[in-house]
């Protein structure tokens, strides 16, 4: 359950119910074997992102935002090493699929999965932090009327993502794309949470936002891979292989940036005030 319902319970109690459901699912995921192709680490981090997306939507009316957002951020950070390990393999695999050259095949062949017991301590730390958040979630409450909070939250998440897209376009720096990636993800969570107000219309929005998130996510992963290679943390035989890998990454980054800006023009075409009016009109007329 990751949806506000315009015909459902009051927004204040719905906020708590969604949060508690996500927290309980996150804790349950830790005890489940990996049967979906997604790792426990992937699922744990996905839940924390959804929770933080929820908090950002209600931030204008939630006094506990800073404390709980920081707690969830720290929980996710406890898994960052495991996440980086997994993503490195997936990034190499995706790059090899895009351009199947022998260098990438060799790097993939030399990349091994660490033993599962290496995950135990970080996962235990993650669980401990999530249990602490879960213990407080039942007392979370909004300090502003629900509709007022949602309206301010929609405006804030959209405006932030739109501004960061423009920064990425103007400055073309990896950190600017990283900031845009995070804020676009948050805006996607906002629209997903409000989707029941106009399932068909907002469903189309979510689809394009997801495509943009995928392009920006691949971009970020490749930037990290490029830094990892430059720091000597990949089994490259010498400068020639480093230059070859760097050139491949640079070419792919250029393609992803072009794709991201094209999708961004669709997602962020409206001014923040107009977008907010449109979304809230769906909610009020549902």
Residue ranges of each PLM-predicted region?
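Function-determining surface determinants
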Residues: 1-286
């Amino acid at each position: 359950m990751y949806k506000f319902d315009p015909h459902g319970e009051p927004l204040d109690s719905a906020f708590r119910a969604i949060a508690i459901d996500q927290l309980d699912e996150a804790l349950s995921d830790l005890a489940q074997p990996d049967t979906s192709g997604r790792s426990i680490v992937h699922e744990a981090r996905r839940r924390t992102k959804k929770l933080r997306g929820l908090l950002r939507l209600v931030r204008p009316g939630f006094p506990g935002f800073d404390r709980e957002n920081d707690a969830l951020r720290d929980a996710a950070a406890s898994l960052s090493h495991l996440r980086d390990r997994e993503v490195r393999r997936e990034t190499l695999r995706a790059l090899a699929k895009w351009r199947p050259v022998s260098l990438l095949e060799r790097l993939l062949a030399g990349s091994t999965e660490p033993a599962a017991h290496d995950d135990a301590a970080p996962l235990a730390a993650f669980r401990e932090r999530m249990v602490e958040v879960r213990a407080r979630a039942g007392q979370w409450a909004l300090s502003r009327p629900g509709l007022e909070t949602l309206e301010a939250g929609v405006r804030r998440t959209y405006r932030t993502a739109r501004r960061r897209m423009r920064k990425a376009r103007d400055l073309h720096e990896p950190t600017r794309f990283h900031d845009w990636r995070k804020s676009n993800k948050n805006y996607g969570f906002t629209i997903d949470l409000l989707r029941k107000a106009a399932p068909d219309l907002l469903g189309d929005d979510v689809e394009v936002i997801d495509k943009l998130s995928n392009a920006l996510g691949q971009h970020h992963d490749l930037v990290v891979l490029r830094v990892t290679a430059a720091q000597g943390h990949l089994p490259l035989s010498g400068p020639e292989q480093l230059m070859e890998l760097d050139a491949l990454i640079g070419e792919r980054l250029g393609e992803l940036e072009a794709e991201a800006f094209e999708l961004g023009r669709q997602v962020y075409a409206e001014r923040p005030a107009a977008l907010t009016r449109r979304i809230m009109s769906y909610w009020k007329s549902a």
